[in-house]
């Protein structure tokens, strides 16, 4: 099963997260299937590759709670 989850990047105390499609059995920093966006909580910036995310959701991928909250704040689920 594939999930859309956050992958931590950046420096110490300056976390930046990539939103990735990754297999459930992989660890957080494991190999991802595809990068679908990023989230910077410090600068409050979000980028979502919407066509790719929709493709993964149609194939049965499940977003984690945090990714779902970030997507709602960005207005992604309003478009559906």
Curated annotation (Swiss-Prot):
- Record localization: Plastid, Chloroplast
> GO biological process annotations for this chain's record?
mitochondrial translation
Is the keyword Plastid in the record?
Answer: yes
Source domain of life is Eukaryota
InterPro entries the UniProt entry points to: Ribosomal_bS16 (IPR000307), Ribosomal_bS16_CS (IPR020592), Ribosomal_bS16_dom_sf (IPR023803)
User: What are the inducing conditions?
Assistant: Transcribed and spliced in green leaves.
Q: Which GO terms describe its cellular component?
A: chloroplast; mitochondrion; small ribosomal subunit
Which keywords does this chain's UniProt record carry?
A: Chloroplast, Plastid, Ribonucleoprotein, Ribosomal protein
- Establish whether keyword Ribosomal protein is in the entry: yes
Gene Ontology terms for molecular function: structural constituent of ribosome
Q: Which family does it belong to?
A: Belongs to the bacterial ribosomal protein bS16 family.
Which HAMAP family does the record associate with it?
A: Ribosomal_bS16
| PANTHER family the UniProt entry points to | 30S RIBOSOMAL PROTEIN S16, SMALL RIBOSOMAL SUBUNIT PROTEIN BS16M
Q: What name is this protein filed under?
A: Small ribosomal subunit protein bS16c
Q: Which organism does this record belong to?
A: Lotus japonicus (Lotus corniculatus var. japonicus)
């Amino acid at each position: 099963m594939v999930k859309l989850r956050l992958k931590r990047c950046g420096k110490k105390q300056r976390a930046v997260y990539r939103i990735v499609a990754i297999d459930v059995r992989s660890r957080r920093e494991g190999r991802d299937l595809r990068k679908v966006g990023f989230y910077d909580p410090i600068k409050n910036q979000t980028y979502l590759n919407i066509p790719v995310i929709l493709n993964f959701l149609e194939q049965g991928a499940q977003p984690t709670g945090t990714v779902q909250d970030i997507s709602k704040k960005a207005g992604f689920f309003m478009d559906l």
